[in-house]
């Protein structure tokens, strides 16, 4: 467990706990449990009363989180599924409403450091998998080896906002005629050939786009958010951490389209402190949005 502590620092923990407005007896959902960084603190705030419901699609990560949470309290239940199943979960638990829900849309540092599934361009020897769950069939390699040039170009533009998406797609199609994409290094060779050096690594947007599509992240997020007005108790809170403009746009649109039922607690988006960014690089692009269910 010490190893887990080292590789996982929950982003904006103090702010998240503050805006969830926790107290003993409340029913809280952590829709993106991960290694349980935020949930550990949520359990402490509940003080053995109420219920924490944790959701994660990665069984390996879920089991690690379970061991961590057991050391704090036992008033929690975990589900190995996608968070767009939240209404089904509440039905199974015979619950009508929840008091708070957290979405931390960043992928766990476990996936970069320990999963060996090719989430990071810093791991050239890993396979191009990028699946959070083995129940998903489509891998990053499948996309690179089978999508046509237009599909690849659209993917990199829509989900990565990569300005050289067309050029990159063309080069990928050319390259796979000679050699299939299997490992991270195979993709990096093409990226480095097409995309010039940038402030952030030139593969960042490409890997983001592939990860989003492999795991159907945008559609799952939209489906989950649409359920919130029906499951959040009056004055209940929704707290969302986003890390890139695509998912942040989805969250902004949700608050806008459901303003009759949920109002934004803060007029402006909340950003991590300079100190936190210095201590935890994963926090640098984080944006925190908070909504409250109208009575």
UniProtKB/Swiss-Prot annotation:
Q: Which reaction does it catalyse?
A: cytidine(1402) in 16S rRNA + S-adenosyl-L-methionine = N(4)-methylcytidine(1402) in 16S rRNA + S-adenosyl-L-homocysteine + H(+)
Say yes or no: keyword Cytoplasm present.
yes
One Gene Ontology cellular component term attached to this UniProt record is: cytoplasm
Supply the name of the protein. Ribosomal RNA small subunit methyltransferase H
Q: Which species?
A: Dictyoglomus turgidum (strain DSM 6724 / Z-1310)
**Record keywords, A-Z:** Cytoplasm, Methyltransferase, rRNA processing, S-adenosyl-L-methionine, Transferase
Localization = Cytoplasm
Query: Which HAMAP family does the record match to this protein?
Result: 16SrRNA_methyltr_H
Which family, according to UniProt? Answer: Belongs to the methyltransferase superfamily. RsmH family.
InterPro entries from the UniProt entry: RsmH (IPR002903), SAM-dep_MeTrfase_MraW_recog (IPR023397), SAM-dependent_MTases_sf (IPR029063)
Pfam families the record matches: Methyltransf_5
Amino acids binding S-adenosyl-L-methionine: 36-38, 56, 90, 104, 111
Q: What is its EC number?
A: 2.1.1.199
What role does this protein play?
Specifically methylates the N4 position of cytidine in position 1402 (C1402) of 16S rRNA.
Annotated GO biological processes are: rRNA base methylation
What is the predominant subcellular site recorded for this chain? cytoplasm
GO MF terms here are: rRNA (cytosine-N4-)-methyltransferase activity
Q: In its keyword annotation, does this UniProt entry include Methyltransferase?
A: yes
């Amino acid at each position: 467990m010490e190893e887990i502590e080292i590789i996982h620092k929950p982003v904006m923990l103090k702010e998240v706990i503050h805006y969830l407005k926790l107290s003993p007896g409340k029913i809280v959902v952590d829709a993106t449990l991960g290694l349980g960084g935020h949930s550990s603190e949520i359990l402490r705030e509940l003080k053995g009363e109420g219920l924490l419901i944790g959701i994660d699609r990665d069984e390996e990560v879920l089991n690690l989180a379970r061991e961590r949470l057991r050391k704090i309290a036992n008033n929690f239940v975990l589900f190995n599924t996608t968070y767009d199943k939240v209404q089904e979960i509440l039905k199974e638990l015979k619950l009508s409403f929840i008091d708070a829900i957290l979405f931390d849309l960043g992928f766990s540092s476990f996936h970069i450091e320990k999963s060996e599934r090719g989430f990071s361009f810093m791991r050239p020897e890993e396979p191009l998998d990028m699946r959070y769950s083995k129940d998903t069939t489509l891998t990053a390699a499948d996309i690179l080896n089978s999508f046509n040039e237009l599909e690849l170009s659209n993917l990199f533009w829509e989900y990565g906002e990569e300005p050289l998406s067309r050029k990159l797609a063309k080069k990928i199609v050319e390259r796979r005629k000679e050699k299939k994409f299997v490992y991270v290094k195979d993709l990096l060779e093409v990226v480095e050939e097409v995309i010039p050096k940038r402030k952030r690594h030139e593969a960042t947007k490409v890997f983001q786009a592939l990860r989003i599509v492999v795991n159907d992240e945008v559609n799952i997020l939209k489906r989950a958010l649409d359920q919130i007005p029906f499951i959040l108790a009056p004055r209940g809170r929704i707290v969302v951490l986003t890390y890139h403009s695509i998912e942040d746009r989805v969250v902004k649109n949700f608050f806008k389209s459901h303003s009759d039922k949920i109002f934004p607690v803060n007029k402006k988006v909340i950003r991590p402190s300079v100190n936190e960014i210095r201590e935890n690089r994963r926090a640098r692009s984080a944006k925190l949005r908070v909504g409250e269910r109208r009575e």
